[in-house]
């Protein structure tokens, strides 16, 4: 689901709210999460999950096209860990 599809679905569920207000809320939430991660903070939404940073150590990689070794520097990557309630909701037994 894209961001615009999310906003459309929220608008359909909340017809009394203007679409622009929903758009501003979605963008605001995503910006808050991004800004918090940029500052090194962890964001937890109880029952849904938490967003944090994982730090990757420098390592020796390989260029898949040429096979040459490439030094990759250390970096931080965003990480999402699903909460118990979200895990339970999506764990549908066949």
UniProtKB/Swiss-Prot annotation:
Record-linked CDD domains: IHF_B (cd13836)
The keyword NAD is annotated on this UniProt entry: no
GO biological process per UniProt: DNA recombination; regulation of DNA-templated transcription; regulation of translation
Keywords from the named record: DNA recombination, DNA-binding, Transcription, Transcription regulation, Translation regulation
GO cellular component, one term: chromosome
A Pfam family this chain is assigned to: Bac_DNA_binding
Domain of life of the source: Bacteria
Gene3D superfamilies xrefs: IHF-like DNA-binding proteins
Molecular functions per Gene Ontology: DNA binding; structural constituent of chromatin
Summary of the function given for this chain in its UniProt record: This protein is one of the two subunits of integration host factor, a specific DNA-binding protein that functions in genetic recombination as well as in transcriptional and translational control.
Subunit structure: Heterodimer of an alpha and a beta chain.
Family recorded in the similarity comment: Belongs to the bacterial histone-like protein family.
The protein's name: Integration host factor subunit beta
Organism of this sequence: Haemophilus influenzae (strain ATCC 51907 / DSM 11121 / KW20 / Rd)
Lineage: Bacteria, Pseudomonadati, Pseudomonadota, Gammaproteobacteria, Pasteurellales
Gene: ihfB
């Amino acid at each position: 689901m894209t961001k615009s599809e999310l906003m459309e679905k929220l608008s359909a569920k909340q017809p009394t709210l203007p679409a622009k207000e929903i758009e501003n809320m979605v963008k605001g939430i995503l910006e808050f999460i991004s800004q918090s991660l940029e500052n090194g903070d962890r964001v937890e939404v109880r029952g849904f999950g938490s967003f944090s940073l994982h730090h990757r150590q420098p390592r020796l990689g390989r260029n898949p096209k040429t096979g040459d070794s490439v030094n990759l520097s250390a970096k931080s990557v965003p990480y999402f860990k699903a909460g118990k309630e979200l895990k339970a909701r999506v764990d549908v037994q066949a």
